[in-house]
């Protein structure tokens, strides 16, 4: 399994370099099969943006979120590759379901 594409769907930057929110879509599939993949989405939010926008009375428990101090797209790719590595199974469907524990899998 590999990342076949990583697309930014939404980008928001504040006044500071450490104030941001991104929405991503990632295509993950077997390296040896062209075109075969599953689509997942996730959000990336800075600690500063989360602290500012998050309700003082709320609790957040959700998959499909990455929280980062600074924006680094290469680090994001490495994190997704790590998720894929942890999720690999001989059965691709099981691998896809394992990845879905971390990222939101789009419905077919």
Labelled PLM ranges:
Residues 1-92:
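Short helix/strand-capping turn motifs
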Residues 85-108:
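C-terminal charged interaction modules
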